[in-house]
Amino acid sequence: RLCIPVIFPC
């Protein structure tokens, strides 16, 4: 899956 730290911490 795509991991976007801006929306949620990976």
From Swiss-Prot:
Subcellular compartments: Secreted
Keywords recorded for this protein, A-Z: Amphibian defense peptide, Disulfide bond, Secreted
SS bond partners: 3-10
Transmembrane domains' residue ranges: none
GO BP terms in the entry: defense response; positive regulation of leukocyte proliferation
Keyword check for Disulfide bond: yes
Top-level taxonomic group: Eukaryota
UniProt tissue specificity: Expressed by the skin glands.
A GO cellular component entry from the record: extracellular region
Location, primary (coarse class): secreted
Role this protein plays: Induces mouse splenocyte proliferation through binding to CCK-BR.
Protein name: Riparin-1.1
Naturally occurring in which organism (per UniProt): Crinia riparia
